[in-house]
């Protein structure tokens, strides 16, 4: 099964510098994310290139809007767009179209003028896009709650995003938002581990199905191999 994936992470501003360094690949080493292949960093590309640092981009937009900012205000939203690894591999040539379509969907919802960075990472196992925006309303208020909505609205976001992407790629399936799974939003590192575990569990379920007297030995070997692989995934 191939899933569309859309994740929002609300940020109050303190993480802007570290997120900037990660998304824009300004670090020399990436110990926290060993999946990054430094030899492929040049393959990354922007749909929106930041003019300044993330901190400056955020500060500039808020100042220009002249809006009120509280200590607990969400100053920007870090958005992740990706797709199941098997789909990305099978549709490698179509990945630019995938991210362009996702970008068009998001800019209509959050306001293109509020987006200060949209970068596609091709230097990891699965291509993905990080899109960051300041949640400014049309009447110049800082309100992530109004733009993203409540839990019910987040489910609608997933429905609409899936409909947009599946119109082009009908084989895709809808991702499940955290409000439905009861699972908190995951960091990229944890997400990769959970995805790997989910994939192994699906294969294990398949290996244990349709067991009969003729294939029992082979099925047992497949299950044992998958269980060993699961034990190596440290969550």
Question: Where do the protein language model's features map onto the residues?
Answer:
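N-terminal nicking endonuclease/strand-transfer module with a His-rich metal-binding environment
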Residues: 1-232
């Amino acid at each position: 099964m191939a899933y569309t994936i859309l994740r929002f992470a609300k940020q109050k501003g303190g993480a802007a510098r570290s997120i900037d360094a990660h998304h824009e690949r300004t670090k020399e080493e990436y110990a926290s994310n060993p999946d990054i292949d430094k030899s492929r960093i040049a393959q990354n590309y922007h749909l929106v290139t930041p003019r300044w640092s993330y901190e400056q981009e955020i500060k500039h937009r808020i100042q220009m809007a002249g809006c009120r900012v509280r200590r607990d205000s969400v100053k920007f939203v870090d958005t992740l767009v990706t797709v199941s690894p098997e789909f990305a591999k099978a549709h490698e040539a179509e990945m630019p179209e995938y991210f362009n379509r996702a970008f068009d969907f998001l800019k209509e919802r959050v306001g293109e003028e509020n987006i200060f960075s949209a970068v596609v990472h091709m230097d990891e196992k699965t291509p993905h896009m990080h899109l960051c925006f300041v949640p400014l309303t049309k009447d110049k208020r800082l309100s992530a709650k109004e733009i993203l909505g409540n839990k019910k609205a987040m489910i609608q976001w997933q429905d609409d995003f899936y409909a947009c992407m599946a119109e082009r790629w009908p084989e895709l399936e809808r991702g499940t938002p955290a409000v439905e799974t009861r699972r908190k939003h995951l960091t990229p590192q944890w997400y990769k581990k959970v995805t790997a575990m989910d994939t192994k569990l699906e294969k294990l379920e398949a290996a244990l199905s349709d067991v009969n007297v003729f294939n029992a030995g082979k099925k047992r070997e497949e299950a044992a191999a998958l269980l060993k692989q699961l034990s190596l995934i440290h969550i």
